[in-house]
Structures are given as C-alpha cells and as structure tokens.
C-alpha cells in the first residue's frame, strides 16, 4: 500500500471565501498564468462565491470566455492579435452557452496560446478547465474518487483540509469551513482506509482549538494541517496549546514549507521558514511529529547549494537528522521536469539522501493534488517519479516513511518500530469500526486486519441519498415521467438518469419550452421551498430561470440536478 501524504480534496463550495479567491488568483498570477486570464478567473470565482453552481465543462468554458470579454484590456488584446485568433467571431459573438464543446475548447486554447510568452511553458494553462471541473465536483468524496481511480486499489491518500479565512469572516464563510469539515469526514467514511483526513488549524479562528479537538478525539481526523503564510506565526501561544495537545494525543502535524503556494501577504511567506521551529521543538515538544511539506521547494534537491546551511531545504535536512520526529515531503516538485540538468541533480541528491537510514523514513511521498492538476494529473506525477527511482527508493518514500509518520505498526515483521498503531491511528480505526455498518465501500485490507470486525457497506453516496431533500425532490418529480423499467429500478439507479431520458422530453412539442419545462422548473423549486431557504445570491426568479434552462437542455443527470438544488437552497443537511 502506497500512501500520498499530501493531497487536497476540498471543493470550491467547501473552501471558497473572499480571502480564498484572492489567495487562489494570486497563486495563479505567481505561477505565470496570463494576467487577462487571471482577471477573468477572478470574476468567475467571485460569481461562484456570490451564487455557487455546479457547471459542466461546456458551461465552465462558456462562462470563462464570457468573463474574458468583460475584462478591461481584452478588446485591445484582440485587435493586436487578430492574425493569431481564428476564433475571433466566437469570442466577440453572443450565445456562447449554445456553442459546441469543441468550439469552446479551441477558442480558449487559441486565446491562452496568444497570451503566453512563447518561451514560458507554464504560461499556457492547458489544464485550467480540468482543474475547475475537479474543484467544482459536488462532493469531497467525488474529488477523492477522482484521485483514487488513478492509483492502485489499496493505495491511500492523506486529505489535508485548508482554512483560508480573513479577520472579517462572514457567517457564510464560517459555514463554508463547517461544510469542508463535514465533507472530509464523510469521505473518510465513504472510502474507509483510503482517505486519511488532517484537520486544518488557523489560530485566527475563534473556536479553532475546540473544533480541532472534537475532530481528533472523535477519530475522524488523524492529524492537523498548518499553513503559516496565511497569516500566523508558528510560535504563538495559541499554537503552543495546539502542539501540547498534539503531543499528548500523539497527533502528527503537516505544515506548508515553501516560498510558493498561498499567502495572505508576501511578508507572511517567511512565517513558513523552518528556522522558526527552533524555539518550538524544545523540551517535551521536541517529540512532536512534524512534516515540513515541499522540502522547502523543489530547488532544495534540484539546484547547487539547495541544501546549504541557512537555506530552507538545508534547515529541514538538519531538523530531520537531529530531531526525533521531523519529516518532509516532495509535493508539487515539478520545475525540475523542464530542465534536464536540474532533473539529474534532483534525483541524484534524493537517492543519496535516501541511503541514510534515518532519512529513509523521513522523506515522504506527496503530490499536492488537486492543486497539482494545474500542471498535470495525479497519475502523471506518480509515473514521472516511479520511472526515475528504483522500486526500493520509491518504497521508502511512499510506504515506509508515510507509515512511520502517520503511526502505522511496523512495516515488515521483525523490523524495529511500532508494534501497534499510534494513538491517532487507533482512534481512526475505532471510528471506522463504530461505523462499520455505515461505510460507503469495503475498507482497505489494513483496516480489516487491524480492526478485526466485519464491515457491511450500507452508506448511500453523499450526493444521492434518501435523507437529502433535493435528491428526494427531483426523484419524486422525475418518477412521474419514468418508464416502467426506470421506476422499477428504484431510487439508487435513478441517480444517473438524464433528463432527456424521461417522458417529458419532446423538443418537437410546441409547448415544450414555454409550458412543459417552465412548469417543471416551478414545480421543483416549489417542492424545495418547503424544505429549505434560498442561499445567498439566489431567489425564486433566478432559481426558476436556471432550472428552466436545465429542463430545456435535458443533458444533466438527476444527481446533477440535485446538486444544483443543494447550492440554490440552504437545506438542513448539505450534500458535501
């Protein structure tokens, strides 16, 4: 079983705040995404924050192109690049939402190609729409499945929550964080043993300690995630209280430790400096399990002097050698891929470090997906490293090290190390065992072996269950238009029915658009009004207009309609 210790499974719905929009678009700009596209993405994300939706690829492309046309400077850009933009008619015309998918894809590709410097391989965001599609999935479990499907059946991922908040956090932003908590816990139950959650701690959140303690004590979460560049120092009294708890409860900590990523202010990037931990990892706290993610950056391994004394990489290396429980990971190390000399140095250095017995347990495998998707897929990242490392080396970073950091028992019989799970992992095993009849799938083999209980998967998918008001509403409406076979198949099978497969779908009927589809939209919205209130940005007229278009096109599945309704309304139980 390989373990990726660094992934993010949150959806836009469960992470997007005003501060998150600012941090995300700043990261895109820092990564070389063209300015016009960054500004269009900012407008797009602001709209999703004000009135969230579930959009498919065609809808995302149409919205992005529409926002590009509204950005100041775009018309001048078009005039200056007419010869390079054969899709000028598309980007100037109306009716973007009616254009075929391939036309929209080609238009965005041509635009981003023209925007990017010819020598900047990172300037053309080929994968930006794929990233948005992944981030706009309806539930955190769906994001987890997207990553897990690219791995071997027993492989596991550590799901790191994120808390990107501002001091003037709104009630909506607070609810967003709670949804991320709920959705991450749900993913652990849906995919027992394959999704291992870490709770995000931000000391600026008034009840951060109570929320963290509840998550850890319950067994749903096995570690905590810190992101100092979001605006807090690691040696604060608030975090020292967190560290004391982590030491007592035997909880590992993973923190962002590179010059890239998200930051509240550029001055806060230095809050991630590993030298800041010299004053923390003393006395009893010297025993803390701490992973300094990213090894300070890819250049620690890929450039001359990257591990010199005083560098972030050099400091992390010193901590791993001298402290009893310090680790690092290789997440989002991609820049060396574009420079053969840097790539050779990178893997030579990594191989040399892994020859040291202590370091062979301290350097961990991580990808930083889904954020990595801006450049490549999870499978591509894994394949790149496995092709350049020996099987023994990869086993050290993807099996031996992660097991040691997370608290697994010894890797091989007779090998020195734990003989029982660490307390953090044992709590998670107890949590899964207590919910053995309420998991979404059969657990990983290691869970069955360490719990010795019989699991009976009976948990419905988080995006389609009978307790969900929107799922019940669209199913009840659709049932009146189902064939006998569709009705007999039942609730679970109805999940993936497309609207156009139902009996109402007849575009040749002169009353189809103005009467049938509009009537269905009104009926469905009325049914939901009985169980929830309109979410910010939505009202009855907007909701009916949106559903009218959905029924008219007929290409969405029932589960997608339920997901849209879950965004339009605030129900007592959200689908995350």
PLM region descriptions:
Residues 11-14, 165-169, 206-208, 232-234, ...:
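Short catalytic/ligand-binding loop motif for oxyanion handling, primarily in non-cytosolic enzymes
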Residues 18-27, 221-223, 233-365:
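Catalytic pocket-lining loop regions of alpha/beta-barrel enzymes
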Residues 156, 160-272, 327:
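Active-site gating/metal-coordination segments in enzymes
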Residues 473-516, 520, 529-552:
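Long, low-complexity or tandemly repetitive, helically biased scaffold regions used
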